[in-house]
Amino acid sequence: MELTSEEYEELRGLLGTPDIGNADTLKKAFLKACKVHHPDKGGNEEAMKRLLYLYNKAKIAASATTSQVWYFLIIGYISLKNKNIYLPKIFWLRFQNMAPHSGNSGGKNSIKALMSKICIVMRN
């Protein structure tokens, strides 16, 4: 359940940001936009409903991607440790494309470190 390009543009407009960025900037922009669009603060009720819908959809898509990345990391780590599990090259290409480029720094560094180990082993 990912955002379409139209929904992405609409969310950017409602948030008032040029780019959504990572989860932290998305949340900050969302909270700021809630103050603008909330009906109790003089905002439009329909705009607020749409903002909530698009924000939740973006969060679900982001968490699904994060779950997929961790799944691939775990499978890759098992294959790295056992050295007896062969995974096709397409798996690794897909995995590399899914690696997050932004987000909270806690998981980002560990993902990058493990991914680089897995990719080095697969190249050899």
Swiss-Prot record:
It is found in: Host cytoplasm; Host nucleus. Keywords: Activator, Early protein, Host cytoplasm, Host nucleus, Host-virus interaction, Oncogene, Phosphoprotein, Transcription, Transcription regulation. It comes from the Viruses. CDD domains: DnaJ (cd06257). InterPro entries: DnaJ_domain, J_dom_sf. Transmembrane segments: none annotated. Residues 10-96 form the J domain. GO terms for cellular component: host cell cytoplasm; host cell nucleus. The common region of ST and LT proteins comprises the J domain. This domain is essential for multiple viral activities, including virion assembly, viral DNA replication, transformation and transcriptional activation. This domain is also required for cyclin A-transactivating activity of ST. Promotes efficient viral genome replication by accelerating both G1 and S phase progression of the cell cycle. This is Small t antigen. The lineage of its organism: Viruses, Monodnaviria, Shotokuvirae, Cossaviricota, Papovaviricetes.
